[in-house]
Amino acid sequence: MSSYRDGSKTNIDKVKNNLKQPNMYKLLLFTLMTIVCLGGFAQKNAVLVEAESFANKGGWVVDQQFMDVMGSPFLMAHGMGIPVKDAETTVKFPAKGKYRMFVRTRNWAARWTDQDAPGKFQVLVDGKAVAPVFGTESSEWAWQDGGTIDVSKTTATVALKDLTGFNGRCDVILFSSDPNYTPPFDDSQLAELRRKLNPATVNVKDGGKFDFVVIGGGMAGTCAAISAARLGLKVALVQDRPVLGGNNSSEVRVHLGGRINLEPYPNLGNLVNEIGPSKEGNARPYENYEDDKKMQAVRNEKNLSLFLNFHANKVNMKNDRIESVQATNTETGEKLSFSAPLFADCTGDATIGVLAGAKFMTGRENSKEFGESTAPEEADDLTMGSSVQWFAEDKAQAVPFPDIKWALAWDEGKAEHLTRGDWNWETGMGLDQVAEFERIRDYGLLVVYSNWSFLKNHSSGKAKFEKQQLKWVAYIAGKRESKRLVGDYILRESDLIDHKVYPDGTAPTSWTIDLHYPDPKNTKLFPGKEFKSIAVHKPIIPYPIPFRCLYSQNVPNLMMAGRNISVSHVALGTVRVMRTTGMMGEVVGMAASVCKKHNTDPRGVYANHFNDLKQLMLKGTGNPGLPKIQNYNMGSTLPAKKQ
């Protein structure tokens, strides 16, 4: 299988030495009592500044994609080779005097190269740059020593100054009046330090009691929330980005795919048609993805409360049921708790289900498990990858691009002579799409910059690219697959190929069984480090997804819509496109209303009240009178069988 497991070592040891620690191993084994003492020290003599909370973020962006792995959102200087505007904030110190300064950061390209560092930045205190340049040491998240600063006032302006435009990142800045203090590297101790120094973020506020809480604001979650709200439910939609749409937002820029308004429920998809963009194409200008259209549709619903920039990362259980979900604001650290009798996991990564102990699958099943001819003989960890798309635009004059030292080794044989990277710029197959996702995204950035630098500075055809400038490179990677929650039924290849339709069929999937693999040509050039993929298609007859695939087998009040539903890896190839996931959301919202009507769980809807759900699916929750604009990228399909 494809892998980036290149055996490169981190620079953690170097960082530890730079921090002049007498015994790092003792530090990593601090007892709970030590942490408590540290907390007392911290409150009196230290200040911790979370970068994502900066009052003025300038040109830096908040990146929350990996906070469950590395501990926090962070600020990133995503300038595509042009330094971004400074981020600034005001910091209050407990007293004047000298402070040791530490910055938690990383040299994100050090895993692949030891030549220079891409994401260099400085920290300015009251306009004066602290001596070290940051982002130059460890390939992993670690503290970089900033030396000692002299604070002449108890209030100071602290700024982050980007030096390169190449994704420098800052998690947190720590000031300590103890000249011998060393901050913890251990994840649990660091989390405790954050709580001690920012006690306001410890309190969990009541976010409200709802009939239905939807986690994840992609097409699936947005449609689920609107659908339920229109049927009279009090709904919360919790989304960890500032926009809605997920992969179809302007942050990722993947166009919608699949067909809507199909039998046996031709009004399913009206809501997708209502909120979906009218233009097709991947990696296109911002306006094509109509973020405002989705946002306005949600804000128009009086029964729907929207919580943007809240990342759900904790569940409270009672009697094997989800009682509430806790979410953290990705900028302020504020924590809210949302209570409801019913929840929907539309996160894509099955985040809520996994936290709740729901059964899930990952990787490829073997061919015998579900009797699938397309599946491998032996199960493995291969998943479809994530895309870092990009495009360039023409300018009136020549535009330079840095000849980067930290680029991957490139030549004419490796060069991609393109001005747009589409879906097939795909990385991470064979890696954990959750635990290793920052590495996956960063490799996607690295190959885009390496290729573009070569085209602009060394290619034999560089004249063609002289007036081209990178207009957009995704820093939110477009993910296809990670974890799939297990429902009362697991959809499999034979159901689709043999068209075994079940009585609880709902939203129809029409896309081909579309599975991605490393491009063999790219493998020859980048063995084990591929960044391009191929798609292998197997067409199907439009197939109604069983409702039993849309709720958890062992968490009774949890439903799901999107790419994390109950399907095999092979079956995921068809259901994962966004018009299909949007229709799943419509159905899940309808099912939530049936649950409330009959005071039952999703399994009860299947067993006793499915006719109620049928009637809602026949009627739909979208506006049927709107022009049908979802007529692009519908995909190949086989004609429906005659009944």
Task: Name what the model sees in each region.
Residues Q43-K205:
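Extracytoplasmic
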Residues P199-V202, D206, N247, N309, ...:
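Flavin (FAD/FMN)-binding glycine-rich loop and adjacent Rossmann-like elements that form
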Residues G221:
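N-terminal Rossmann-fold NAD(P) dinucleotide-binding loop
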Residues M1-Q43:
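Bacterial Sec-dependent N-terminal signal peptides
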Residues D206-G218:
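Beta1/beta-strand and adjacent pyrophosphate-binding region of the FAD-binding site
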Residues A228:
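Aromatic pocket-lining residues of Rossmann-like dinucleotide-binding sites
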Residues L233-K234, Q239-K318, M361, M384-A392:
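Conserved N-terminal/central alpha/beta ligand/cofactor-binding core
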